[in-house]
Amino acid sequence: MSCSCGSSCSCGSNCSCGKKYPDLEEKSSSTKATVVLGVAPEKKAQQFEAAAESGETAHGCSCGSSCRCNPCNC
């Protein structure tokens, strides 16, 4: 998934930035699924902060209306 600001301040080729996980859209199906839930190891505060700062939102860029970057300074 491309969610970065491209040329002309657009949101990427597939314009799906508003959806964090476009592959997981709700779809109607007659088949049953099994969901397995688990527990992840605890992260220390420093690890969490480093992970949060590494995302694209740290640059202040997100997809706004009409698939344009907001703000347009990426």
From Swiss-Prot:
Alphabetized InterPro entries for the sequence = Metalthion_15p
| Stimuli inducing this protein | Under different stress conditions, such as excess heavy metals, heat shock and salt stresses.
Q: Does the keyword field hold Metal-binding?
A: yes
Q: What is this protein called?
A: Metallothionein-like protein 1A
Key words, A-Z: Metal-binding, Metal-thiolate cluster, Stress response
Q: PANTHER family given for it?
A: METALLOTHIONEIN-LIKE PROTEIN 1A, METALLOTHIONEIN-LIKE PROTEIN 2A
Highest rank taxon of the organism? Eukaryota
Role noted for this protein: Metallothioneins have a high content of cysteine residues that bind various heavy metals. May be involved in ROS homeostasis. May act as reactive oxygen species (ROS) scavenger in response to salt stress.
MF (Gene Ontology): metal ion binding
Q: In which tissues is it expressed?
A: Expressed in leaves of mature plants.
Gene name of the encoded protein? MT1A
Pfam families noted in UniProt: Metallothio_2
Which family does the similarity line name? Belongs to the metallothionein superfamily. Type 15 family.
